[in-house]
Amino acid sequence: MKWRIVVELAGADGAVQFHEISVGGAGTVDHSVEPLGLGLTLAEGKKTLAGLQRHLVQAQTEEHCRNRRRCQGCGAQRPLKDMRRRRLASLFGVVEVRAPRFGPCRCGVASRRTLTPAAEIMPDRCTPEYERTLAKMGALLPYRRARSLLEEFFPLGDTPQVETIRQRTMRVGARLERDAVAPPTSSPSSEAESITLAIDGGHVKSVRSYQVRSFEVFVAQVSNDAGKRVMFSSVPAEADRQQQQLRGVLHRLGATPRTPVTILSDGADGPRSLGEAASVGPTHHVLDCFHLSMRIQHVAQAARGWPDATPGDRAEAACLADAIEHIRWRLWHGQVQRALDLIGDTLVILDAAAKTASLHAASAGKVAGVLRGLETYVSGQSSLIIDYATARRNDEPISTATTESTVQRLLHRRMSANQQMRWSPRGAHLMLKVRTAVVNGTFNNDHTTAERWARRPFRHAA
C-alpha cells in the first residue's frame, strides 16, 4: 500500500495552497508482511509532524506580516526595510521563516519605529508550549535525562542542549516568582473558615564557590477547611519578598483577616516567623508531634542498650522503659509540667547510677545525656505543645508528616545528595518555583499568567 499526506491551507483572503507533507509505500498487508511494517513508524510520524509544522508556521507568519504591513493610520503599505530569517523552535521541529522588517509609514501617524511582525508572534523564538515542556522536563528530571527523552519522542530537529534546557527552566522560574510577588487583583472567591500551614525545612548541597556547604530551603503545605492543598517552597537567601509570596498562597485559599491560621512547625524560629509574618489573620503555633515523638524515640533507643545480664539489670531496664513510656503519654496528652517532673526524677536516678562502678554506669550516662536533651527541647517548646490526643479526636492538624513527604518529593527526588548534585541558592530557588507549580498541577496556567513578566530584548512595535 502506498500513501501520501497532503495539507490544505486556506488563507483569510480565500487563497488555497496544497503542500505534500510525506509519502510512503509498502506491500499489501498479508501474512508475509512483518508486524514492524504495519502503520506509521515513529520516524515517519516525526517526519510528518515536522513537515506539517513547517508549512503551517510559514503560512501563518506570511499572513501575519502581510496584515501588519498595512498602516493603521492611513491604510498605505509600509516600505520594506530589509528581509531577514528567523528560526522558531517548537515541539515539532525548528522552522525557519522569512522575517521582513518594515520602516515607519510616511504618514508618521501610527508609529515612527521599525516594525518586525515576526518578532511579535515569536517573542522568545519558540512556542510557549515548547518553553513550557522544556521547563517542566527540566524540573522533573536531570537536564541530560530530559534532553534524551525529548530527542527520543519529539521531532525537534535540533535537540536543545543541556544548557538550553537549564536556561529555559531558570527563565520560567524567574517569571513565576515575579508573578507570585504581584499584589492580588481581587478578593478571595470564598472565605475559608480555617487554614493550616505546615512548614518545614530541608538542606541542599551548595556549589563549592558558595560560602557554606549547604543552604536551607523552606517547604510548606497549606490547606483550608475545604480540603484544598497547595505546596510552597522557597530559598530564604534568594527569595524576592518571601512573606508576600506565601501571603499570596494563603489569599488564594481564602485567607482573610478573620481566618484563623494554625502553624505547624518543628519549633525553629525561621519557619515560625515566616508563617507568622505571612498570615493576615490570627495565628496559633503548634509543635509538630512528629518531631516531638522522634526526640522521645531517641531516648527509647538509647535505653535499649541497657545491660540485661542479671535479673536486677532487667528489672532496671523495664523500669526505665516504663518511665519513658509515661513521658511519651504525658506529652501526647499535653501534660508538659508532669512530663518535665518525671524527666527530672528519672535523671536523678540515672545520674546516681552513672556515678557507680557497676556495669551499667556507661549506659546510664548515655541515656541521661539523651534524656537531658529532651528536657531542654520540651522546656523550650512548652508553649507550643498541645493536647494531641484531643486534637486528633477532633480531626485537628497535629503533624507535619505530609510536609516531610513534600520535602522528599520536591527536594530529594530532584536535588538529592545521592545524585552528587550541587546547587547555587539562586538556581535551586528558581528550580523549586517550577517544580512546585508542576506538583501543584497549576504550571500550565501559571506559565500563561506569568507571560506579562517576560523580559525580552526587543521593543514592542506599534
Predicted segments, located by residue:
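Catalytic center-proximal scaffold of phosphoryl-transfer enzymes
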Residues: 1-52, 99-462
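Short Cys/His-rich Zn2+-coordinating modules
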Residues: 46-60, 82-92
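Short metal-coordination and nucleic-acid-contact micro-motifs, chiefly zinc-binding Cys/His arrays
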Residues: 60-70, 84, 97-101
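Amphipathic alpha-helical interaction segments
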Residues: 63, 78-81, 278, 418
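Short cysteine-rich clusters marking metal-coordination/redox-active sites
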Residues: 71-74, 104-105
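Cys/His-rich microdomains that often coordinate metals
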Residues: 75-78, 111
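Short, isolated positions in well-ordered beta-strands
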Residues: 78, 95-97
